[in-house]
């Protein structure tokens, strides 16, 4: 009975049989690969490499002992025209293998083969023979995706955010895979820009998911990659109109996250550079959506401590809006005043630079709406102990348009800033600030001597009152001190 039960159990295969089976499978695989040659590379399913092979992903055929050699395919000039497109697709598949660049001594030959193949692909895309087929577009996007979409591993940046000056001085982090990445980006760029690319076909593969992943790469620490991404995204925005609202909204969300959550992102300057071109192309009158973007996304970008890294591009975008619609000047200036730095003098100089650019495009009605709070802030800048801040504020009078705006409204503005000007002439430590202040006073005195005289009299009257109040305050404290001393003595 036991024998009958045991005989029904499945027998465990011996290690010898297993080895024999594995060997025969390997031979079969080798034979199949040798028969099919390179033509099977295109259709072969990807096989994941071993951990130490140096390959991340690819289409190399397994043979039981490792992989078929990573070998160069024939050149385009060596095949008939009818075969060139098939060869192009095969070369794209070959370039889907991603190498490990952390060790420069590993896979040197294979890396060079891939680089040469990528160069051939760049030339082929740049000089196509007719429209690109859907298969070609699909394979190009697949190859690009395999190579560029990866997890970014940023270096710790806690200290970088604290001081933008340190961030600017540090050497940028360079991606070791750039010799391949650069060519991959070039292929993508040429595909998008090519007149032989059918937009209707391409948008199936360059879709919102692709664009979203592309936007994520802007946080790369390599400035060369961000520069390529900037060009690629700009081309996509220009060619694929269907993606325009999505791109604007996505950048908007990245700005929100940067301003209100992380204050960490490497690609803000590049995004703003793209937006500067986009804003320049906005049709008039501006849509409400675009005005909301200005108020909720661009103006708050003045708050982060790393403003210096992207201020030039931000200032250009802001100025573009005001030039397109001068009624936005009041909104922009009040936004600047709301974010005005209190303890960061270098940032304050940047704000004054931007303020001049905005005022350059501001018309009298908008200027009059915001001139009171604006020149209260300018007065504080005039009295700044940091000579560059005071000097930059005084330079506003060197701009003819701004000087005209001020002089048209001098009866409101001069009483606000006169105390600051007078204190500079009396107390400021810097000789350049002292001289510039005298020049500004002379401008007002030459245009409206009576107003200047009234403001001077008012200033002296206020100074006298302040001195009296100060003397009374001092006498009161002295009296309180005497009373306290008397009580202390009496208690003893």
Swiss-Prot record:
Description of the deletion phenotype: Reduced plant size and fresh weight.
Keyword entries, A-Z: Brassinosteroid signaling pathway, Cytoplasm, Peroxisome
Entry keyword annotation includes Cytoplasm: yes
Principal location: cytoplasm
Location within or outside the cell: Cytoplasm, Cytosol; Peroxisome
Sequence ranges of Low complexity compositional bias: 16-39
Expression sites by tissue: Highly expressed in dry seeds. Expressed in roots, cotyledons, rosette leaves and flowers.
Region of interest called Disordered, as start-end residue ranges on this chain: 1-63
Pfam family, one: B56
GO function terms (MF aspect): protein phosphatase regulator activity
One cellular-component annotation, GO: peroxisome
GO biological process, one term: positive regulation of fatty acid beta-oxidation
Coiled coil: none
Keyword Cytoplasm: yes
Upregulating conditions: Induced by epibrassinolide.
Motif Microbody targeting signal in this chain: 490-492
Biological function: The B regulatory subunit may modulate substrate selectivity and catalytic activity, and may also direct the localization of the catalytic enzyme to a particular subcellular compartment. Associates with the serine/threonine-protein phosphatase PP2A catalytic subunit C and regulatory subunit A to positively regulates beta-oxidation of fatty acids and protoauxins in peroxisomes by dephosphorylating peroxisomal beta-oxidation-related proteins.
Complexes and interactors: PP2A consists of a common heteromeric enzyme, composed of a catalytic subunit (subunits C), a constant regulatory subunit (subunit A), and a variety of regulatory subunits such as subunits B (the R2/B/PR55/B55, R3/B''/PR72/PR130/PR59 and R5/B'/B56 families). Interacts with BZR1. Interacts with PP2A2, PP2A5 and PP2AA2.
Family per similarity comment: Belongs to the phosphatase 2A regulatory subunit B56 family.
Protein name stated in the entry: Serine/threonine protein phosphatase 2A 57 kDa regulatory subunit B' theta isoform
Annotated source species: Arabidopsis thaliana (Mouse-ear cress)
